[in-house]
Amino acid sequence: MRAKQHISDLAHHCIAHGMRHLVISPGSRNAPLIRAFAASSQIECLSIVDERSAAFVALGLATELQAPVGVLCTSGTALLNYGPAIAEAYYLRAPLIVLSADRPARLVGQQDSQTICQDNLFANIVKGSYSLPEEPETVAELELSARVIAQAFSTALSPCFGPVHINIPLDEPLYGGELMAESLIALSPLQLAEPKGMSPALWQEVESAWRGAKRRMIVCGQGVADAELQALLARFAPDKTVTIIAENTANIVGPWLVDRPDAVLLACDEASRSLLAPDCLISFGGHLVAKHIKLLLREFKPAFHFRLDPAQMGIDTYQCLSAELDLAPTTFFRRLAQQVEPAAGFRDLWALPEGVAENQDDEFLVLKRLLGQLPAGSIAHLGNSMSVRHAQKLASRADLLYHSNRGVAGIDGCLSTAVGVALATDQLVLCCLGDLSFVYDSNALWNRNLPSNLRIVILNNQGGDIFRRLKGPSVSPGYQDFFVAHHPVQIGKMIEAYGVAYRRCLASEIDGFSEEFLGLQDGPLVLEVFVDPTKRD
């Protein structure tokens, strides 16, 4: 048996289980892992030095590809830098495979260099934590290693996607030795968990509640485009007792749904709000951006609320959960849509009133222009926190896809995630974010693989503009310094230091820049738009 045979096996087995992309940050302890993966022609390896950015790039790849993507680092604090992206992957449900090199157990806690306790480091934000055997010497130990890898991938991929952490203790020597062209150990098959379905009694309860309700609502949370799900939900169009809520991040579109629920609720008088609440609610998917629809459903609780979630995590966003159904949405609606009959009613109340004044924020008008001009098939990656909110005020385009890091909704990796998305597709990817978000994640541009289909628009409002809009911070001591946090960074010079093409304009000049900005380029392009933070609704 060759030295580090289990590392060669790890690379072969990760590839066999569907990993085709790996983002590597350099180090010494992970040298055997780097050698094993870099030697394979079946996986694309990207080198990104900053581990925090690297993990978000991997997250973007996994989100767009809907497939397992790996991220690999050395031991010590390098691994801690993966934390924000792992948390986002956990709540966004992305199949991120975290591979960390480690010291042997005998050296942990013994003042050895670059050593922390890495086992179960992310226990609360991964679906599973695993550790490979230290330097296995027997076939039985290698077979155990193969089973651990298969179990990790099974957990990451079923019943819903999510991140897993595989820790790999490595002893010296770390360099040299022969790499095996194939594994000596048979591949352990994946044991993918399937949704368990529903008992006949529970089906009867759900169908009875649905048929008996006069005001029925389906809330579609954040998700990826799914043609079958889209077609199934379209079957409810003739039945206006059914209102379907789907923001652009749900990637479900149609004239029969409500894509701007908060706009409707904000235009509604207080006395009429209760009429917009359903008797029976079906929900699925990830987070909503809209705040007021959540407040409505918590205040005027439906008699029945059924959430579709094979992960069975007990999520009760609206504080009125009747039952969590262990079914995929397509399976559920395939059956429920058989009962659709034309009817009038509830949905008409959710029509956006005519004559509602359009938002006149500089930021909103810039986003409206750019999102309106994006070529069909493009992807809009919406940064936290104002960019994604402004985008919810626009009608969803059926020919675009929408991404956003709404799992945890932090600003720390928006740009790096967009880079990963752009690396996974040939379509144009527009990343919209604010100046603080850009500066925070500017190391996303410290990347030799930046794709030419990436466009970045920075809405520079001189700080964290969301805090100017909230009543609390604006009357707090230190408001400008500690909430808005205006910064002195000259963003243009920063971008030029990374060697990326850069343009700048005022919000009022966007019409003269948008065509060039969204057109074909030889590389990525950044447009910094200076907006007036006082010009807002």
UniProtKB/Swiss-Prot annotation:
Its needed co-factors are:
Mg(2+); Mn(2+); thiamine diphosphate
Keywords, alphabetical: Magnesium, Manganese, Menaquinone biosynthesis, Metal-binding, Thiamine pyrophosphate, Transferase
GO molecular function terms noted in the UniProt entry: 2-succinyl-5-enolpyruvyl-6-hydroxy-3-cyclohexene-1-carboxylic-acid synthase activity; magnesium ion binding; manganese ion binding; thiamine pyrophosphate binding
| Chemical reaction(s) catalysed | isochorismate + 2-oxoglutarate + H(+) = 5-enolpyruvoyl-6-hydroxy-2-succinyl-cyclohex-3-ene-1-carboxylate + CO2
Cofactor binding: number and manner: Binds 1 thiamine pyrophosphate per subunit.
Q: Does the keyword Metal-binding apply?
A: yes
**Which spans are transmembrane here?**
none
The question of whether Metal-binding is a record keyword is answered with yes
Q: To which pathway does this protein belong?
A: Quinol/quinone metabolism; 1,4-dihydroxy-2-naphthoate biosynthesis; 1,4-dihydroxy-2-naphthoate from chorismate: step 2/7; Quinol/quinone metabolism; menaquinone biosynthesis
Give the InterPro entries listed for this entry: DHS-like_NAD/FAD-binding_dom, MenaQ_synth_MenD, THDP-binding, Thiamin_PyroP_enz_TPP-bd_dom
Q: What is its EC number?
A: 2.2.1.9
Among the GO biological process terms of this entry, one is:
menaquinone biosynthetic process
> What's this protein's family per the entry?
Belongs to the TPP enzyme family. MenD subfamily.
Q: What is the recorded function of this protein according to its Swiss-Prot or TrEMBL entry?
A: Catalyzes the thiamine diphosphate-dependent decarboxylation of 2-oxoglutarate and the subsequent addition of the resulting succinic semialdehyde-thiamine pyrophosphate anion to isochorismate to yield 2-succinyl-5-enolpyruvyl-6-hydroxy-3-cyclohexene-1-carboxylate (SEPHCHC).
Q: How does it assemble?
A: Homodimer.
> Can you say what this protein is called?
2-succinyl-5-enolpyruvyl-6-hydroxy-3-cyclohexene-1-carboxylate synthase
Per the UniProt record, the source organism is: Desulfotalea psychrophila (strain LSv54 / DSM 12343)
